[in-house]
C-alpha cells in the first residue's frame, strides 16, 4: 500500500489517471447531485467545492463555521485551519474532525441554506429519494457525518438556557455513525423537521448490521490506509425503505422488546396507538389524543414466517399463540378458535426501517437547515463523530447494493494528495 502511494506520488500522470478514474466512478453513477472529494477547490487554498453534473448551476462551496458561535453567540469563529488535512484518502485528501475540548467550539463545514434552497441538494417532498455516501475512518463517536439535519435549538434543556437564537428543528436527511448502534451506518430522515411519536427527538432511523471499529486518527499511515470504511444510507420513496449500508452491505437488524428501549419505546407505543385506533370504541391503553399522523403501523397483511408458540385445548376452545414475522415487525398473535383476540409487538426492524412519509419540505422563508459535513446543529453541543472524512456524495435516488459495493471499492487503496491543491 505504501509503495503504491509513493509510486503514484512520484509519477504525476499515474496519479492524475487514478484520481480521474475514481472521480468518474462517482460522478458517472446515475443520480449524482454533489460529490466533495476535498481535493477539488475554488482555487489553490480556496474553499472545497463539489463535483456536480454537467450544466449544474451550483458547485456547493463549503464554508467553515462554529454553530455554537452562530446560535449561542459563544466561542471562537471557525476556519479551514480547524480541519487538518491527511495528505491521502480515497480521492487524494481527507479532513479531520477533531475531539474539540472547548465546549463552545463545534466546527463544521457547510453549505448555507441560502445557497442550497430549492437546488438539487435540497432533496425533499413527494416521491423524492436520496442516498448519502461518506468515506471515513471513525476514531470515536456515533453522531453526524453529513446531511441536512438542523436538530433545532428550541428544546427546553440546560444546554439551551443561554441560547441566543431559538430555532425549530429543520431535519430532512442525514447519515450518522451509528447513533443508537455506535459505529453502524445510520440513516436518518424526517417528515416534519422536528420530532417523532411524541418524543422530543426525530426517531425515523436505520442501522446497518455491521459496525465500524475505532481507529486512532493519529495512527501510522499504513494503519490508516487500511481503515477506510464506506458509510451509506438510502431512502427509496417507492418502497418506503430507509436502509443503512457499511462497505456496500446492509444486513438485517432487529430490535427485540422495543417497549424497553429508551427512545424506540415511543415507536412501539405509536404502533400500539395506531392498532387500537382501528378498533371501534375506546380501548384499554388507547390515548385518544395521540396524533394520527404519528401512528407507526408498517404493513402486516402477509407474514414471511409463522412460528406456533403454544396450542392449548381447554373447555372445548382452541387457544393458539403465534409469532408472526412481517417485513418490518414481529408480532405475537393470540387466537381463540382461530379468531384473533390479542396482538403484541415483539420486535421492530431497524434495517431496513419503514418510513411512510415524504421527506420534510421547509418553508421558503430561509428557516430550512444547511447541508453540513462533520457535525450537525445540535442542542446538546456534544463532540460527536471524530476521525477522517475522505469524501461525501449525495444522490437523488436510492442506490442499489452493487452500486454501493463499487463505491466502497474506491476506498481500498487510498491515493496521495496532489502536489498542488
Go through each PLM region and give its residues.
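Extracytoplasmic low-complexity segments
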Residues: 15-110, 159, 166-169, 255, ...
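Acidic glycine-/aspartate-rich tracts in secreted/extracellular proteins
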Residues: 38-45, 139-142, 238, 249, ...
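Short, aromatic/His-centered strand-loop micro-motif at the edge of beta-sheets
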Residues: 187-232
Amino acid at each position: 500500500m505504501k509503495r503504491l502511494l509513493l509510486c503514484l506520488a512520484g509519477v504525476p500522470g499515474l496519479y492524475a489517471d487514478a484520481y480521474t478514474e475514481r472521480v468518474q466512478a462517482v460522478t458517472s453513477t446515475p443520480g449524482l447531485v454533489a460529490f466533495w472529494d476535498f481535493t477539488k477547490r475554488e482555487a489553490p487554498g480556496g474553499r472545497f467545492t463539489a463535483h456536480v453534473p454537467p450544466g449544474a448551476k451550483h458547485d456547493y462551496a463549503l464554508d467553515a463555521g462554529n454553530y455554537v458561535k452562530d446560535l449561542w453567540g459563544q466561542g471562537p469563529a471557525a476556519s479551514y485551519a480547524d480541519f487538518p488535512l491527511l495528505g491521502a484518502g480515497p480521492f487524494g485528501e481527507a479532513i479531520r474532525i477533531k475531539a474539540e475540548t472547548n465546549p463552545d467550539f463545534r466546527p463544521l463545514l457547510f453549505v448555507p441554506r441560502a445557497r442550497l434552497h430549492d437546488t438539487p441538494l435540497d432533496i425533499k417532498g413527494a416521491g423524492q429519494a436520496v442516498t448519502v455516501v461518506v468515506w471515513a475512518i471513525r476514531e470515536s463517536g456515533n453522531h453526524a457525518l453529513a446531511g441536512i439535519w438542523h436538530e433545532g435549538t428550541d428544546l427546553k434543556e440546560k444546554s439551551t438556557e443561554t441560547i441566543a437564537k431559538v430555532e425549530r428543528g429543520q431535519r430532512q436527511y442525514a447519515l450518522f455513525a451509528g447513533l443508537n448502534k455506535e459505529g453502524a451506518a445510520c440513516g436518518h430522515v424526517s417528515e416534519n423537521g422536528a420530532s417523532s411519536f411524541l418524543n422530543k427527538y426525530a426517531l425515523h432511523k436505520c442501522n446497518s448490521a455491521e459496525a465500524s471499529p475505532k481507529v486512532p486518527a493519529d495512527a501510522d499511515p499504513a494503519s490508516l490506509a487500511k481503515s477506510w470504511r464506506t458509510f451509506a444510507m438510502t431512502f427509496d420513496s417507492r418502497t418506503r425503505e430507509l436502509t443503512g449500508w457499511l462497505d456496500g452491505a446492509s444486513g438485517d437488524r432487529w430490535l427485540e422488546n422495543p417497549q424497553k428501549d429508551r427512545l424506540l419505546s415511543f415507536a412501539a407505543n405509536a404502533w400500539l396507538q395506531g392498532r387500537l385506533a382501528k378498533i371501534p370504541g375506546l380501548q384499554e391503553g388507547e390515548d385518544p389524543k395521540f396524533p394520527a399522523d404519528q401512528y407507526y403501523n408498517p404493513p402486516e397483511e402477509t407474514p414471511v414466517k409463522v412460528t406456533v408458540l403454544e396450542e392449548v385445548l381447554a373447555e372445548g376452545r382452541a387457544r393458539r399463540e403465534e409469532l408472526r414475522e412481517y417485513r418490518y415487525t414481529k408480532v405475537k398473535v393470540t387466537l381463540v378458535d382461530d379468531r384473533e383476540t390479542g396482538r403484541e409487538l415483539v420486535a421492530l426492524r431497524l434495517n431496513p426501517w419503514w418510513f411512510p412519509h415524504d421527506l420534510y419540505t421547509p418553508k421558503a422563508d430561509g428557516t430550512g437547515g444547511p447541508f453540513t459535513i462533520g457535525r450537525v446543529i445540535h442542542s446538546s453541543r456534544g463532540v460527536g463523530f471524530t476521525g477522517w472524512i475522505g469524501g461525501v456524495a449525495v444522490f437523488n435516488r436510492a442506490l442499489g447494493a452493487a452500486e454501493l459495493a463499487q463505491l466502497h471499492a474506491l476506498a481500498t487503496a487510498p491515493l496521495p494528495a496532489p502536489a498542488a491543491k
